[in-house]
């Protein structure tokens, strides 16, 4: 089973939250209103949090209400330039799970600018967003030895 995440924008805090879609939801969006978002400083994720769920390839932090560490990012209201996307984020995140070198933060930033926010801009959103990816996840993966699919496009 590939990991699936959904995006929720909190305009009050200028934060885009990525959340894993639970195995029990079978691909449907997470229940609850879009306005229900975690506090600005979420508590630390317990090491066994979400271990009972069967999403192969996700680190345990993926089941936090704040979303997986590697995909948490904040946004600013101005984006100076539009950068061409690099279409290999799934491969990059797979390499991260294996401990291999991956894209720079700048490349990941470009990917999200073009692929996540493109639709909003094409629909006439006036707010332009710049993405900052936070790295350094301290959580262990729940899968082994099968290949890990940390993220797949829909």
Swiss-Prot record:
The keyword Secreted does not apply. It is found in: Host cytoplasm; Host nucleus; Host mitochondrion. A fraction may be phosphorylated in insect cells and HepG2 cells, a human hepatoblastoma cell line. Phosphorylated in vitro by host protein kinase C or mitogen-activated protein kinase. N-acetylated in insect cells. Residues 28-48 are annotated as: Disordered. Keywords: Activation of host NF-kappa-B by virus, Activator, Apoptosis, Host cytoplasm, Host G2/M cell cycle arrest by virus, Host mitochondrion, Host nucleus, Host-virus interaction, Modulation of host cell cycle by virus, Transcription, Transcription regulation. Its main location: host cell. The keyword RNA-binding does not apply. One of its GO terms (cellular component) is host cell mitochondrion. It holds the Pfam family X. InterPro entries: Transactivation_prot_X. GO terms for biological process: DNA-templated transcription; symbiont-mediated activation of host NF-kappaB cascade; symbiont-mediated arrest of host cell cycle during G2/M transition; viral genome replication. May form homodimer. May interact with host CEBPA, CFLAR, CREB1, DDB1, E4F1, HBXIP, HSPD1/HSP60, NFKBIA, POLR2E and SMAD4. Interacts with host SMC5-SMC6 complex and induces its degradation. Interacts with host TRPC4AP; leading to prevent ubiquitination of TRPC4AP. Interacts with host PLSCR1; this interaction promotes ubiquitination and degradation of HBx and impairs HBx-mediated cell proliferation. Multifunctional protein that plays a role in silencing host antiviral defenses and promoting viral transcription. Does not seem to be essential for HBV infection. May be directly involved in development of cirrhosis and liver cancer (hepatocellular carcinoma). Most of cytosolic activities involve modulation of cytosolic calcium. The effect on apoptosis is controversial depending on the cell types in which the studies have been conducted. May induce apoptosis by localizing in mitochondria and causing loss of mitochondrial membrane potential. Belongs to the orthohepadnavirus protein X family. This is Protein X. It comes from Hepatitis B virus genotype B2 subtype adw (isolate China/patient4/1996). The gene is X.
